[in-house]
Design a protein with these regions (language model features):
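Membrane-helix interface segments in multi-pass membrane proteins
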Residues: 3-6, 71-109
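Hydrophobic alpha-helical segments
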Residues: 31-37, 65, 78, 82-85
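Alpha-helical transmembrane segments of integral membrane proteins
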Residues: 11-14, 18, 29, 59, ...
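Membrane-interface extramembranous regions at the lipid-water interface
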Residues: 1-26, 30-62, 117-133
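Hydrophobic alpha-helical transmembrane segments in multi-pass membrane proteins
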Residues: 60-75
Length: 133
């Protein structure tokens, strides 16, 4: 791979990492842009240390989406049970629903922190010119 091509792909990866960080300020609406960018240029980096960054970002995206959806579904299910318990005057259901909603929110929070950690770790490795594991 030529130096110009490697430099271009390095800048491209900096942009995608940046877009992932910016997506936190757009309620995740920009998440789709860097993942499309990663899939578009992924094969251009085959056989280089830069390919690890494309794979790292793609895996980070998909695992984050799956766990975020799981957390949201658990929370929504629990809050629905909480609403039913208010109508039925059942304290046990209310306590269980509150605990389950807390568990769902814990999953969402952990996913948020894990995603941010992976973006920061990957971006630091890219800046240092190293592959990510």
């Amino acid at each position: 791979m030529s130096n110009d091509k490697r430099r271009s792909l390095t800048i491209y990866n900096h942009i995608t990492y940046f877009l992932y960080v910016i997506s936190y300020f757009t309620a995740g609406l920009l998440w789709i842009v860097p993942i499309v960018m990663n899939y578009a240029k992924r094969h251009d980096a085959d056989g280089t240390w830069l390919s690890t960054h494309f794979d790292w970002q793609i895996k980070t995206f998909w695992y984050s989406i799956v766990w975020f959806i799981i957390g949201i579904v658990i929370t929504a299910f629990a809050l629905g049970g909480f609403g039913v318990s208010m109508l039925a005057d059942s304290g046990n259901i209310a306590i269980g629903s509150t605990l389950l909603a807390g568990f769902g929110l814990l999953i969402v929070t952990f996913t948020f922190i894990w995603h941010l950690y992976r973006i920061i770790r990957g971006w630091i490795a890219l800046t240092d010119g190293r592959p990510v594991p």
